[in-house]
Amino acid sequence: MKISDFTLPEIEYFRANCNFVNLEIEVFERRAKEITLEEIAEYLHISYDYARQISVKVNKKIIKVL
């Protein structure tokens, strides 16, 4: 799922209703700006695999509120 494909009102809805925590917020915001997981991992000083794991959690939360 590409978060950047959602409209701005949809992204705002996810921010308000998905209850993202800590790194999930960071990953969500950067994915909304089309930043790759590799770049996100580097920026947050975490491994790529951990960034991918957080991204999966973000996707699951988005699917729950859809």
Please state what every model-predicted region is:
Residues 39-44:
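Short alpha-helical "recognition helix" segments of helix-turn-helix
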Residues 59-66:
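C-terminal flanking helix
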Residues 2-17, 50:
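Short, Lys/Arg-enriched N-terminal segment that forms or immediately precedes the first helix
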Residues 49, 56:
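Key DNA-contact positions within bacterial/archaeal DNA-binding proteins
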Residues 17-24:
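Short helix-coil-helix linker/hinge
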Residues 27-28:
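A short pre-motif secondary-structure segment
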